[in-house]
Design a protein with these regions (language model features):
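Phosphate-backbone binding interfaces of nucleic-acid-interacting proteins
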Residues: 1-113
């Protein structure tokens, strides 16, 4: 387990629900990656992320799906892509990412607490 944090620290993390609207391969990345655009509703808008999720996910099975992401992460340039959010997932025994998503359809932009 990682170091414990206080509620005040956790409360600073802005985690939201969004819907994937586009997916394409990041051809410049050293490791197979996808550039994912996610709609987080009116308040936050559309944000993009570069994610190493190609083992289980593709444009065909990811577009239209809802995901959970950290929306106030500092932007990072990853292989020519400005990654604006961090899409959340669990990591299986082989190191492959399994995305976290709501169990029911949710409004884009709803906060996770």
């Amino acid at each position: 387990m990682k170091e414990q944090i206080t509620y005040d620290i956790f409360d600073k993390v802005d985690i939201r629900v969004g819907t994937v609207i586009s997916v394409k391969k990041n051809e410049k990345a050293r490791k197979p990656s996808l550039v994912v655009e996610v709609d987080f509703g009116e308040e936050i808008g559309i944000k993009q992320s570069s994610a190493q999720i190609t083992h289980y996910y593709s444009e065909e099975n990811l577009k239209g799906k809802q995901v959970i992401a950290v929306c106030n992460f500092v932007e990072k340039n990853i292989a020519g892509v400005v990654s604006q959010v961090l899409i959340l997932g669990s990591i299986d025994k082989e190191g492959k990412v399994i995305l976290v998503h709501p169990s029911q359809s949710s409004e884009n932009g709803l906060p996770i607490s």
